[in-house]
Amino acid sequence: MQFTKLATVLIVSLMGSAAIAAPSVDNAPAVAAEEVAAAPAENLEKRGFGCPLNERECHSHCQSIGRKFGYCGGTLRLTCICGKE
């Protein structure tokens, strides 16, 4: 009985250490915080397209890019969502 418990603990611990030591499959380079901070802030101003206060601006934006309509949705209606039909 003791041997079975000891063998189980040993196998589980070896599997755990092998999983931790295994190399990562996705080694994509990370973006440094300085590069993100240096990016122009002009995109932040355009992100909402009038949402949540001016839904007409969102609608006009969506029509300008070839969509049928636009409305404010998502969390706290902060995202301009464009529809095709």
Swiss-Prot record:
GO CC entries: extracellular region
InterPro entries, sorted: Defensin_invertebrate/fungal (IPR001542), Scorpion_toxin-like_sf (IPR036574)
| GO BP, sorted A to Z | defense response to bacterium; defense response to fungus; immune system process; killing of cells of another organism
**Signal peptide location in the record?**
1-21
List keywords of the entry alphabetically: Antibiotic, Antimicrobial, Cleavage on pair of basic residues, Cytolysis, Defensin, Disulfide bond, Fungicide, Immunity, Innate immunity, Secreted, Signal
Fetch the Pfam families from UniProt: Defensin_2 (PF01097)
Q: Where found, per UniProt? A: Secreted
Listed as disulfide-bonded, the cysteine pairs are C51-C72, C58-C80, C62-C82
Q: Which residues form the propeptide?
A: 22-47
The UniProt PTM text for this protein says:
Disulfide bonds are essential for antimicrobial activity.
Describe the family membership recorded for this protein in Swiss-Prot or TrEMBL. Answer: Belongs to the invertebrate defensin family.
Briefly state the protein's biological role.
Antimicrobial peptide with broad-spectrum activity against Gram-positive bacteria, Gram-negative bacteria, and fungi. Also inhibits clinical isolates, including methicillin-resistant S.aureus (MRSA) (MIC=32 uM), K.pneumoniae, C.albicans and C.parapsilosis. Displays minimal inhibitory concentration (MIC) values similar to minimal bactericidal concentrations (MBC), suggesting a disruptive mechanism mode of action associated with membrane lysis. In vitro, shows hemolytic activity against human red blood cells.
The name of this protein is: Fungal defensin triintsin
Identify the species of origin.
Trichophyton interdigitale (strain MR816)
Organism ancestry: Eukaryota, Fungi, Dikarya, Ascomycota, Pezizomycotina
